Amino acid sequence: NRYDAVRGWGARQDGETIRRDTAPPLDEAIIGLSGLPPHHLGWGQFRAMGAAALDLCAVADGRLDGYVDCSVDAHGVWDYAGALLVCSEAGVEVADAHGRDLCVLDPEVRRTPVAGASPTLADALLEARRTF
């Protein structure tokens, strides 16, 4: 799959516009994980594909409903920056688990991205992630 996005012009997968407006509740959602959480976070199912950008784009295109980075500040901006724009343009909420800015220039800085295909799911995932 190939993803592209231009700020203000939307996001595409293989040339087709992608947009997320809704998501199931957390207990029915399919969530992408990076790392292992210390306890079940309430999802219906989970997947672990091994690449933050791929997982985030899967939320944007509808293959996943959300994404949680369960590691402790393991991702540099290069791990997710392109996918962050795709998600933003597709209507997906993405935030750092600790409320910090995800767009940073310092290559030493690490972040913990969490995404949800709807604001309600994003809030539920952020709340669950903050339990550890």
Question: Which residue stretches match the model-derived regions?
Answer:
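DPxDG-like acidic metal-binding loop motif
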Residues: N1-G8, R12
